[in-house]
């Protein structure tokens, strides 16, 4: 039969590869970065949640911004440029995990991987809307799966909508899993005046003054 499959409302997840060496940044994280426990899952995060303001991360920040422009303007075709807001390091020792969560007050989120290998658990994306009925599946794909395990390599950045639920299973390796996460937002406005959806941040700040 003649047929056409249409993928409605696809969720864009982009992976980009950092080509430069990042040993200096990783060495800084391992030796100088202060960590605090992040919840009850035996994982840690950096005390500093604005790490990309530090000069040592300037090359990585430029790579993140370039990747964001590809994601936002070439894939999503949006006009308002995204800027990085908070940024922090995740430190997952052996036997730790990362609970399911989203990133509120952010549009697109990113995770850069400093130290991962094939023995470590991949990031897991979970379906936002549940399937109404459980049916027996003989082969899983993007239409019938409730979660998606995405293997990542060191030096890769992954970008995804901040509303997308994600988690990390227990680290069963004997090494620390180290990554850097960041959130984004616009600096000027959201929406469109013509469509009556405009939120002009600069104008709001002027009124406050």
Which residue ranges define each predicted feature?
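Non-heme Fe(II)/2-oxoglutarate
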Residues: 1-80, 88, 196-204
């Amino acid at each position: 039969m003649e047929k056409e499959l249409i993928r409605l409302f696809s969720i864009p997840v982009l992976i980009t590869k950092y080509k430069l060496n990042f040993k200096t940044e990783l060495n800084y994280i391992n030796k100088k970065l202060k960590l605090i426990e992040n919840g009850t899952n035996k994982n840690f995060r950096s005390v500093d949640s604005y790490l990309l303001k530090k000069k040592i991360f300037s090359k990585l920040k430029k790579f993140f911004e370039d990747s964001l422009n590809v994601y936002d303007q070439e894939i999503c075709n949006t006009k308002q440029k995204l800027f990085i807001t908070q940024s922090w390091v995740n430190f997952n020792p052996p036997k730790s995990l990362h609970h399911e969560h989203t990133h509120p007050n952010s549009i697109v989120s990113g995770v850069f991987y400093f130290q991962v290998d094939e023995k470590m658990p991949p990031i897991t994306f979970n379906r936002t809307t549940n399937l109404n009925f459980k049916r027996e599946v003989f082969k899983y794909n993007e239409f019938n799966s409730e979660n998606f395990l995405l293997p990542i390599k060191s030096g890769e950045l992954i970008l995804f909508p901040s509303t997308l639920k994600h988690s990390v299973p227990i680290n069963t390796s004997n090494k620390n899993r180290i990554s850097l996460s960041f959130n984004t937002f616009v600096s000027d406005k959201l929406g469109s005046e013509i469509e009556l959806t405009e939120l002009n941040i600069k104008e709001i700040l002027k009124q406050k003054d």
